Amino acid sequence: MLHKHASGTTRACACSAAMINPGINRFCDVAVVGGGPAGLAAAVYLSRFLRSVLLFDAGDGRAELIPKTHNCPGFPDGVSGKDLLARLRAQAMAYGTEIVAAGVKSLTARPGAFVLATTTGHVHASRVVLATGVVDRAPAMHGLRKAIAAGIVRLCPVCDAYEVQGQRIAVVGPERSALKEALYLRHYSRDICIICNYPEDVSGSTRAKAGAAGIAVRDFVDDLVPRNSGLDLVMADGSTERIDVLYAAMGCDVRSELAMEVGAHCDEDGYILIGPHAQTSIEGVYAVGDVAKALNQIAVGFGQAALASTHIHNAMLAERAGSRCEKEPEAHHQSPNPRPGG
């Protein structure tokens, strides 16, 4: 079964008129790359620390696709991804963050600063926060984005399995990840199946484990057709089976290219490895949100943003204090009025 990126083609950022282009050779304290929840949260913190912040938003983040999330703290009635992002943008800009509707093409470490080559110019930053996220893989099907918006196709059972309790659920993906996700969803519904194109796509071992958990395996699924309510599995013989929800357990592509450019350590899947303050293996470069090796959740991204921003601010305070201390002995040594008898 072919797949494509859930985000579709890259879109221009639907940004406020308050957003500006950075111009050529701008300097800022911190450059944040990525305008999703984690990047925007970092910008809020850093701006409130009185740091100059440029945030680059290419406008193709996965949060835009969220129809409504009910597990984001503080929103008892749920919140759509677009609404959450709009609130975060307004909050960041209210404290002075400059949001740039542009992507970052490259990141280079230079003495005393990092240089970001953007689609509108070059920016020099003392610190960099990477919040570049991931791109979900999803099944190739007509009307995918509408199906995601309608909640018929879902990408995150941790986020929204609560909302599909007792429904007819199908899972598509490589057999190991599909089985893992199906077993997770089995806690919420008894009607779970794994779908595939051909019988050889799912091994006997996986079938046995699925069967033991009461999970069916549907072979010869040729097409997926969204309906007003649910989705039809179209079999090779032309027959159909209606389900309520399809979960795509197809993995994602991690946007860690900028981190790799400066030599930051990543795992085998491309996720950026971070320390307790969201710092990467490169001093001055931090990673927050889904691009970092952790649970891909908005709340986790918020926490990482707070940790990274506070660490950046404290490190810059220490640098400033250190430079003052280094200058003081030199000034004393050059004093034109030495003490008598000295």
Predicted features by range, described:
Residues L2-H5, T9-A31, I99-Q167, V245, ...:
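FAD-binding core/adjacent interface of flavoenzyme oxidoreductases
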Residues R11-A14, A92-P111, L116-T118, V123-A125, ...:
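A Rossmann-like FAD-binding core segment of flavoenzymes
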Residues I20-N21, C28-D83, G173-E200:
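Beta1-alpha1 glycine-rich phosphate/pyrophosphate-binding loop at the start
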Residues G34, A131-G133, A138, V172, ...:
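Short, well-ordered coil/turn residues at beta-beta hairpins
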Residues A43, L179-E181, V288-H333:
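A conserved FAD-binding loop/helix module that cradles the flavin
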Residues A138-P139, L179-K180, S256-E257, L295:
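Glycine/Thr-rich phosphate-binding loops of Rossmann-like dinucleotide-binding domains
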Residues K146-E163, M250-V300, L307, N314:
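FAD-site-proximal beta/loop scaffold in flavoenzymes
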